[in-house]
């Protein structure tokens, strides 16, 4: 079993996008399902994942490093789901790219708000 097959089996959304063009290079099966995507060719990450027409104002591309994850939280306005996000600079087919792992914590957030 190769790495892509393993990533496709995860419950977390995992995607890779080109650092310079924002082109969506890969998204795992759970990500495709959550975002309603089939064919990702020529899609920009900001359009496919956030429904935006230009790069996200909260994009972390400029601060990503190869040796550590940048961890943050965000609510996806397209799906209205809340995520813990882990972003990292990687090489994908020889080019710099962004790896993002998104853990959906919406239910946990809803419970926290209801008991607060």
Sequence positions of predicted segments:
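Sensory modules in modular signal-transduction proteins
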Residues: 1-22, 29
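Signal-transmission coiled-coil "S-helix" linker that connects upstream sensory/regulatory modules
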Residues: 4, 8, 39, 109, ...
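Sensory input modules used in signal transduction
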Residues: 16, 86-89, 102
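PAS/PAS-like sensory domain cap-loop motif
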Residues: 31-41
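Residues that scaffold the ATP/ADP-binding catalytic core of kinase and kinase-like folds
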Residues: 34-35, 48, 111
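Terminal output helix/cap of sensory domains in signal transduction proteins
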Residues: 47-75
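Per-ARNT-Sim (PAS) sensory domains and their PAS-associated C-terminal
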Residues: 65-84, 90-96
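Sensory coupling linkers of modular signal transduction proteins
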Residues: 95-116
């Amino acid at each position: 079993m190769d790495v892509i097959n393993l990533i496709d089996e995860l419950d977390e959304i995992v995607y890779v996008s080109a650092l310079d063009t924002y082109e969506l290079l890969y998204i795992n099966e759970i990500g495709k399902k959550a975002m309603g995507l089939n064919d990702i060719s020529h899609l920009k990450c900001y359009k496919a994942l956030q429904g935006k027409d230009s790069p996200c104002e909260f994009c972390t591309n400029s601060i990503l490093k190869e040796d550590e994850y940048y961890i943050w939280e965000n609510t996806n306005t397209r799906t209205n789901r809340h995520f813990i996000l882990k972003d990292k600079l990687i090489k994908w087919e020889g080019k710099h790219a962004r790896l993002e792992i998104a853990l959906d914590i919406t239910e946990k957030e809803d419970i926290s708000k209801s008991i607060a």
